[in-house]
Amino acid sequence: MNVTAHIEALTHWVAAIAQSLAANGVKDVVVCPGSRSTPLALAVARHPSLRVWMHLDERSAGFFALGMARARGMPAAVLCTSGTAVANLLPAVVEANLARVPLVILTADRPPELRDNGAPQTIDQIGIFGRNVRWFVDLPTPDMALLPFLRATLGRAVGLARSAPAGPVHLNLPFREPLVPDRARMAALFSETPSAVQVTPARRMIGGAELAMLATSLVEYRRGLIIAGPDCPPDLGPLLTTLAHRLRYPILADPLSGVRYGPHVDEYTLGTYDAFLRDERFVSSYAPEVVLRFGAMPTSKPLLLYLQHHPHARQIVIDGGAGWREPTSLAREHLHVDEHWFCIALADALASSQREGPTLWLRAWVSAEQTARTIIQSHLLPQEHISEPGLFARLGSWLPAGATLFVGNSMPVRDCDTFLGPRTNPLYVVGNRGANGIDGLVSTALGLAAGQARPLVMALGDLSLLHDSNGLLAARLHRLDATILLINNDGGGIFSFLPQASETDQFELLFGTPHGVDFAPLAAMHNAHYTLATDWSAVHEALQASFTGGLHLIEVRTRRDQNVIDHRTIWPLVSNALAQAGITVAE
């Protein structure tokens, strides 16, 4: 080997990668320590337009990058060494794929002559993420003659990560030793104008004739719904509100849709349907003729059952990502069109035929929302004991305008859906609902905190925190401000609501999984301010104090058996109130 020529090619190679990332809008690179990734780690660390975020654990690092990409609305990159380090990125890649979050996965590897022959820290990394990435390429070892190909590959990769449906891409990067590039030569390359290849994603649209035909048909339907599921495109709320007013249809807004909270919210925006759609009389009486669906499948199971109860309704899925987020198999029309463009164009097409005043259908849904919300608030807010529903019923007034609430999976996201109703103050509610896992939640939330300048609160269950306790290290390493609202019911609370709860002889062992962990030492380990809040005033005071900065862990303890009672007491109260208000019988 000609070492001088090798280092020259290596330096140009990794410099071109760093320049291409920056030229294509990547600003953040999450780096895990390792030897084989040395050349690229040094390049991204020295590039003036890239910021490096060190992370010691690859699984947490992947989710941290995912959170940053969510916050920025642009791809983040994550770099790791070869071997099992790569495999640890799989959970985050799966989530990014299903949640349509743009990630650029950069994995160092051994060169071909060291693969599949027992070389240390070497595994088969070719296609390791399978169908969970938008694109995979196993790049050649550094070669001066292939620099144009490298730049084209980087531009293509970032472009694919950003294009609808956004998602992860994987670049596998073999490097031979020696691994240290020429520092002075790299600095000179970075001072030159980069010759990067760039890709501009396009928006999907439909023809004017098709849109006019749709508008004409929608005018004929008085009993319509707009459903905004998780992960709607940013800033869709005001456009959906305008469309709802044109059609006189209520919006059933999932808390993770970005539509339930903000100054655009008015009486058309409903957030308590998870409660009143448990009422069989309402479900049977109010059959929709048409349903316009945006985003992923909603969190609410009662809403899913409602749609299944009315299979003959015309369901139209609007998906700018041209994917398939329709597990019910009820929708017979799928429009692969940019959601923003669609809402504006359809609202314009409906302007001349807008209905006068609210319809009886709209009034019934708005009344059901107001009735259920009143019952829930009047039942939960006077309660003295700390409950999981009561916590989310209070968070709407406790969180400051513009805050980010990251909700964990299992019970927290469901309680957020049911009990944290619409509000006009901006609130950004985020969760990992791609694969619905409880892994990587702390790291995702801290990635959000790193990528934005808003107060961040993560509401997590105890098992979720234990799953990703390593992720807390990022808060200390990068001096991040974040509040963990820990809902500790000593195990898997959601199983108490499922049929498994009847298996009493094995329930605690297999499903309840009590652990008895004391979280105070965990907080101390990571220099977090710890509070065990035993009443509502203590929770409120600790939450407000946490917004002064730093990492805070506020623990509230609940009982799983009482939690079931707290939930199941509410549903008959809502049903009775609907009946007394005369809402359960269609007019």
UniProtKB/Swiss-Prot annotation:
Gene3D superfamilies: 3.40.50.970, TPP-binding domain. This is 2-succinyl-5-enolpyruvyl-6-hydroxy-3-cyclohexene-1-carboxylate synthase. Belongs to the TPP enzyme family. MenD subfamily. Keywords: Magnesium, Manganese, Menaquinone biosynthesis, Metal-binding, Thiamine pyrophosphate, Transferase. Pathway: Quinol/quinone metabolism; 1,4-dihydroxy-2-naphthoate biosynthesis; 1,4-dihydroxy-2-naphthoate from chorismate: step 2/7; Quinol/quinone metabolism; menaquinone biosynthesis. Catalyzes the thiamine diphosphate-dependent decarboxylation of 2-oxoglutarate and the subsequent addition of the resulting succinic semialdehyde-thiamine pyrophosphate anion to isochorismate to yield 2-succinyl-5-enolpyruvyl-6-hydroxy-3-cyclohexene-1-carboxylate (SEPHCHC). It catalyses: isochorismate + 2-oxoglutarate + H(+) = 5-enolpyruvoyl-6-hydroxy-2-succinyl-cyclohex-3-ene-1-carboxylate + CO2. GO terms for biological process: menaquinone biosynthetic process. The lineage of its organism: Bacteria, Bacillati, Chloroflexota, Chloroflexia, Chloroflexales. SUPFAM superfamilies: DHS-like NAD/FAD-binding domain (SSF52467), Thiamin diphosphate-binding fold (THDP-binding) (SSF52518). GO terms for molecular function: 2-succinyl-5-enolpyruvyl-6-hydroxy-3-cyclohexene-1-carboxylic-acid synthase activity; magnesium ion binding; manganese ion binding; thiamine pyrophosphate binding. The keyword Transferase applies. It comes from Chloroflexus aurantiacus (strain ATCC 29366 / DSM 635 / J-10-fl). Binds 1 thiamine pyrophosphate per subunit. The keyword Transmembrane does not apply. Disulfide bonds: none annotated. Its EC number is 2.2.1.9. The gene is menD. InterPro entries: DHS-like_NAD/FAD-binding_dom, MenaQ_synth_MenD, MenD_middle, THDP-binding, Thiamin_PyroP_enz_TPP-bd_dom, TPP_enzyme_TPP-bd.
